[in-house]
Structures are given as structure tokens and as C-alpha cells.
Amino acid sequence: IDGEIDAGSSTGSVSSILPALNDAFSDATSVGLILKMNSPGGSPVQSAIVNDEINRLRKLHPNKPVYVVVEDMCASGCYYIAAAADRIYVSQASIVGSIGVLMSSFGFTGLMDKLGIERRLMTAGENKGLMDPFSPYSAKHKEFTQAMLKEIHEQFIAAVRVGRGKRLKENPEIFSGLFWTGSHAITLGLADGLGTVDSVARDVLKAEDVIDYTVREGLSDRVLKKFGAAVGEGAARALGNEWLKPR
């Protein structure tokens, strides 16, 4: 996994990660899996699905351990996935953690008042305009949003607690959204030791060969994806305009 975890990512999406996991687990010659991870995080949904799938496959193949090797960073949604592994290896200066959830936007109501700009937003459903940056952010909407983030955060925390078990130190800062170096992450129980893909394969798995199961997009796949997205957006705009015409 390299880069943001997102449904459209070539290496950080469910559609790219799950086939690779299944191929690696189903290969009769494989003695274990190493997930090389370098990501700041991303979608909690994609992360949770991958976490669940790793746990499912581990139960089906109990003799094949799963090890995560963190390169530069494994934060937020990346760690959500990593927590499902048997062990997590890091470099001393890797960035690890950020177990939290955020949602951000901007508010322009003060600027609009100064400029004399009026927002005319029509909705069907009293809360449809939630998070609209040009409308006031009510206490009710803030409370609703915070409750939703808290729920997702609790799901994240539960996954980490299940994955790390007794190795995790009882430190309230662990789930505060802070992140640490790889060395410090080991002391907190967020990681198990120092290691690289080569060292884990050689010293832990005792594997002579390392096979890369990463699902990679070819040039034609990337072109078709972009072409399809462009056609879809154009069709939506065309249909939307057509629906708005009086009849």
C-alpha cells in the first residue's frame, strides 16, 4: 500500500488490495505474507473492509502469518489495516499512529456578511445543507457531526485493541490522534520491532524468495479509468441539464 487509502487508489483500495491478499494466501508455496505499507491513511470504510478481510483470511489459513512492514509512514487508516497483522515492523524514524477521525470544511459566512453576499440554499430535508460552507454551522449540526466521528473512532479503537491485544500499553494518548516515531511506537505496543521487507522475509519467515502479489494497473487501465470517469461526469451533467428543462 503506497499513498492514500481511497476507493480510486491503484494500490490503496479494496479492489486492489483484496485480490492481492487472496492470491498470496491461496498460493500453496507461500509461507507467510508481508504487507509493505507507506500511507498517511484515508477512507475508514476501505480500511475497515481490508482489516476484516485480513482477519478472515488469517482464520482460514492459520499457518500463514501476516507481517506488516512500515516504511516512511503508517498513520490513521493505514494503521487501521496494519492492526490486523500478527506483527508490525517499523524503521526507527517511521511515523506511526494517528488513531483518530477527522472531517474538515471551511466557513465563509463572516466574509459573506462583510461583502453583502446572501446565500440562497433550498433543500428538501431540514438537514440536507449540513456542512455547507456558505451557511451558518448550527450547534445541532455540530453535535450530530461530532457524534458520528466518535462512533467511527470507537470502531477504529476496537479494531486496534483486538489486533494488538495485551501488547498495547494503557496510555490515553494512543487513541488521541497523536503519532510517534517507529522507535516510540514499539514502546507503546503499536509496533513489535525494527525491520524491513528483506529482513523480515529472511530472518522471521526464513523465506528464500519474495514474490510480489501487488495488483498493478497497466497504462490501458489508467486511460480507461480516466476516460470512463470523464464520460460519466459528462453524461451526468448532460442528463442533469436535460431534467431541469421545462416541459
Predicted regions and their residues:
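N-terminal organellar transit peptides
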Residues: 1-68, 72-76, 85-91, 102-247
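Alpha-helical bundle segments that constitute or directly flank the non-heme di-iron/ferroxidase center
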Residues: 79
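Extracytoplasmic ligand-binding site segments that recognize negatively charged/polar headgroups
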Residues: 98
